[in-house]
Amino acid sequence: EYVWNLGTRSRPNNVYIYYSRLDVGANRVNLAIIARRMASEVFVINSSSSVLTSRPAIGIRIDDDAFFSIHALSSGGADSLSLIQNIHTFFNTEGRRHINWMAVGDFNRAPGRMQEALDSEPGLRNATLIVAPTEPTHRSGGVLDYAVLHNANQTTQNTTVSASIMFNQMRSQITSDHFPVSFVKKR
């Protein structure tokens, strides 16, 4: 956990940075979460994938909400379903069932393909919801970056969260082939 004061000494504006350096080689696919509040818990959840290069999801909990950063394997996101299954299983235990969770990141598969995979898993079919922007999130023209949510207080999932491309941040994305996505609560 790192603390970064975006304000001044007399008017602090702290943010909390949770960072995992997963790619010690090219340094391209490291994960981070930045929060305005300090996390109550920090999580690392692995994929069940047999692929050695599969990256874990990192997450934080603030009150009854958990947030995860994910970067699935390229060429189809073979480990993305496993990551979601393991996050869901982790929170579907005594003492954690009341926690809502949101996994955000590069799933490396279209939301429709991810939904098909989620629908094929009885425990996930009605327990999760995908929130994706309508515009492409990757230079290839595909939507690969989105969120999978679980609301612990609802049996049928619906959301008040929307996703959109952060067009005002596009110029700073020179080295990335993905575009930044913003998730905001609908009013």
Give the positions of each predicted feature.
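N-terminal carbohydrate-binding/catalytic regions of secreted carbohydrate-active enzymes
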Residues: 1-28, 34
